[in-house]
From Swiss-Prot:
Protein name: Putative RING-H2 finger protein ATL61
Lineage: Eukaryota, Viridiplantae, Streptophyta, Embryophyta, Tracheophyta
InterPro entries in alphabetical order: ATL1/ATL16-like, Znf_RING, Znf_RING/FYVE/PHD
Region ranges (Disordered): 142-174
Record pathway: Protein modification; protein ubiquitination
Keyword Zinc-finger: yes
Pfam family, one: zf-RING_2
Organism: Arabidopsis thaliana
SUPFAM superfamilies noted in UniProt: RING/U-box
Length: 204
């Protein structure tokens, strides 16, 4: 083999090595560019999907007001007062003679004191009929007392000549209904408190 041929082969080998090296570097660079582009697109889509905050709504059950619960009388249960056996639906046990019980004024359902008190701490309705538990008492306005007195005096003075109706005037003797802890909520609807919590979106 001539010396010139050996030199040509050496140069050819060097060129082949450089060619492989160049193509390898090019492949790595192109791969990195493609990976960075895909990562940018994924981050952009993630930001669009998680823009702002995540809202969580928590509904909290609220029981009846304490003074309403205290207004419900506690009685000693007597089976002789009932034709059928009564069962406390909270504990699923029968009411027995001497048991301390409460009867809900809005629906006349009976329960053990401990059971219904625990129930009404987180609920405002009857466990059986779901009717709202509250007390409603009626009373006459204070100023009606004076009107009634003057009306009776006038009636006594003129009773010899005129005959008056025994029914009181509608516009003066209308009783006021006091709210017994019911508020303006509808009967049968539990009190729910909605709490909205804003949580910043977690960046990935």
């Amino acid at each position: 083999m001539k010396e010139s041929d050996a030199v040509i082969l050496i140069h050819l080998g060097i060129n082949i090595v450089f060619a492989f090296f160049f193509f390898g570097i090019s492949a790595v660079v192109v791969s990195c560019i493609i990976k960075c582009y895909n990562t940018h697109d994924d981050d952009h889509d993630h930001d669009n999907n998680n823009d702002g905050h995540v809202s969580i709504t928590i509904k909290e059950r609220v029981g009846i007001k304490p003074y309403v619960l205290r207004s419900i009388p506690i009685v000693d249960f007597n089976t002789k007062d009932f034709k059928y056996v009564l069962e406390c639906v909270v504990c699923l046990s029968e009411l027995a003679d001497g048991d301390k019980a409460r009867v809900l004024p809005s629906c006349d359902h009976w329960f053990h004191v401990e059971c219904i008190d625990s129930w009404l701490q987180s609920n405002s309705t009857c466990p059986i009929c779901r009717k709202r538990v509250c007390l409603k008492q009626s009373r006459t306005r204070p100023e009606l007392g004076g009107r009634d007195k003057s009306f009776n005096q006038n009636h006594d003075q003129t009773s010899e000549h005129h005959e008056f109706s025994t029914d009181p005037p509608t516009n003066t003797d209308t009783a006021i209904i006091e709210d017994g802890g019911c508020g303006e909520a509808n009967e049968g609807q539990p009190e729910l408190t909605a709490v909205v919590i804003d949580i910043p979106a977690k960046e990935i």
